[in-house]
């Protein structure tokens, strides 16, 4: 059964790292403002370890499909919003648009296994960074397929595996936002978030 979490079941979601604020607007979308200097990244290339981004999540033990529809209003480099899946702090993935003011922005995914993150990207026109985007993650037996919907068509952007996903831990599934820069955070309008066991 597909569950729509915005606006009907927001109160059933758990928050990881409370954002600057969140509220429902007149269109029944959830507005979330990130805090500055927030991110999800472990070790690789940059050397730092940061796990303080904001996630609104539910949990499952089964295969699933999750989707989010959102509109960002970014203002600083690497402002980002999308979908997030976590098995543990050393095993997780995120997919999002990451804003680059002088463009192009990055559309892609970060996958973290054994405490090391990797990052795959494709260019995305920065002038479209505040347009509506949809992200989808499908889990099948520990394997994850990541999609993005640009305009009217779904596009597969990654297939990956989470090494700790062996069926013995709850899987956190949610939408997320963060602002790695030292500037102010930014607002994202989350219009829809659905999960479905498959």
Where does each model-flagged region fall?
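Extracellular glycan-recognition regions
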Residues: 1-198
